[in-house]
Regions:
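Short glycine/proline-enriched turn or capping motifs at secondary-structure junctions
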Residues: 113-118, 131
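Helix-centered, glycine/charged polyanion-binding patches within enzymatic domains
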Residues: 29, 33-34, 39-113
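A short, flexible helix-boundary coil/loop motif
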Residues: 130-136
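Polybasic low-complexity intrinsically disordered regions
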Residues: 1-51, 116-122, 136
Length: 136
């Protein structure tokens, strides 16, 4: 998702057994300046640098080392979580407005096409006021 415009720029679907970190290169377009991710993307700095050389890795870091809790890392992770939470709004629209709460397995390709169409509609839905002003 683009942080300035607030639009979804890439959609990637996979089987439920595939970890998020394996899909990361497909989600990046190469012009990112910052990549935000949760703990599932930890340690993917090399993958990010391959696709988007200018991007900073802003993924959450581990805060607990043996018996020591790093308070500064914990504070930074809290800030990163607040930034990442803005992306979740798109998934609320996908589920509540467009009714994509339960996915019937129709094949990955068919589900992917359905998700692409829904996210295109979500981009229009999020910018409906701006588009109405431009159309008037």
């Amino acid at each position: 998702m683009d942080s300035k415009e607030g639009v979804v720029h890439s959609v990637c679907t996979s089987a439920a057994s595939v970890a998020d970190k394996h899909m990361l290169p497909d989600l990046l377009h190469g012009e990112e300046r910052k990549v935000w991710g949760d703990g599932g993307y930890q340690g993917q700095t090399e993958a990010i640098q391959e696709v988007a050389p200018q991007a900073q890795d802003m993924t959450s870091r581990r805060t607990k080392f043996k018996n020591y809790i790093d308070e500064e890392a914990k504070r930074k992770n809290t800030t990163k979580s607040k930034v990442r939470a803005k992306v979740e709004h798109v998934f609320r629209i996908l589920k509540r407005v467009f009714g994509f709460d339960k996915v019937r397995y129709r094949g990955i390709a068919k589900n992917h096409h359905r998700l692409c169409a829904n996210f295109a509609l979500i981009n229009l839905y999020l910018h409906r006021k701006r588009l109405a002003v431009l159309g008037a």
